[in-house]
């Protein structure tokens, strides 16, 4: 949330021991993947183990001693106490066995669909949330580079373009363009070493 406190999404609740070295996560009921199969603790465990070996997420598991499932729950044991460990688990969960697919099976609000009209995101009728989705269908366009994306946006062939302040998409602002900030899972830290020159003075 706005205070960077973790919010339960796929788990209904979690518990930890007194010294915060062991966590038990209980999954939310009624959550299914895009193929209709139910989310299980085994799916979560498989995803986290794959994340543990990945370049992107491996650092988050540096303090993890072991992970296992028990009676439909996920148990994570740590090497050292960490009261903020749940905040590290904002990792997309996919169905075990589908992680190597071009489009792995997830539990999100939209389904990736390819039909006669091309690729699109279509509302997931079995999504577990009661949030009203803004669109039933979102058409997708594949582009080879940021210049092409900028051109398609400027010519109104594309109506939504995601860009960050460091991107090379250029200044796309105009009287007919609306800029909207949106939350991401990215956090940027700026650190200063005050123990060495020139900042040690």
What feature does the model see in each segment?
Residues 12-56, 198-201:
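Aromatic- and charge-enriched surface segment that lines or borders ligand/interaction sites
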Residues 113-120, 139-198:
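Extracellular/periplasmic solute-recognition and catalytic clefts
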Residues 1, 7-12, 37, 83-94, ...:
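A structural "hinge/loop" feature
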Residues 25-29, 72-82, 121-125:
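Short, hydrophobic/aromatic-enriched beta-strand segments in well-ordered soluble domains
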Residues 81-139, 145-147:
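Gly/Pro-rich hinge or "lid" segments in bacterial periplasmic/extracellular proteins
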Residues 40-47, 72-75, 135-137, 155, ...:
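Alpha-helical secondary-structure segments
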Residues 15, 57-98:
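Surface-exposed binding/hinge segments that line
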Residues 1-18, 26, 49, 61, ...:
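N-terminal lobe/hinge region of extracytoplasmic solute-binding protein
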């Amino acid at each position: 949330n706005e205070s960077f406190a973790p919010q339960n999404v796929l788990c209904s609740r979690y518990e930890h021991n007194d010294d915060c070295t062991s966590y038990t996560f209980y999954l939310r009921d009624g959550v299914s993947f895009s193929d209709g199969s139910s989310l299980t603790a085994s799916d979560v465990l498989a995803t986290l183990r794959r994340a543990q070996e990945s370049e992107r997420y491996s650092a988050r598991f540096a303090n993890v001693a072991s992970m296992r499932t028990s009676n439909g729950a996920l148990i994570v044991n740590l090497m050292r106490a960490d009261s903020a460990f749940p905040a590290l688990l904002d990792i997309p969960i996919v169905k075990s066995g589908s992680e190597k697919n071009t489009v792995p099976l997830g539990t999100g609000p939209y389904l990736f669909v390819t039909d006669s009209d091309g690729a699109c995101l279509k509302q997931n009728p079995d999504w577990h949330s009661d949030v009203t989705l803004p669109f039933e269908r979102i058409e997708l366009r594949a582009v080879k580079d940021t210049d092409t994306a900028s051109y398609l946006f400027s010519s109104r062939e594309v109506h939504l373009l995601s860009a960050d302040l460091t991107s090379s998409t250029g200044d796309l602002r105009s009287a007919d363009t609306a800029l909207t900030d949106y939350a991401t899972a990215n956090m940027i830290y700026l650190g200063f070493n005050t123990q060495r020159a020139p900042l040690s003075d």
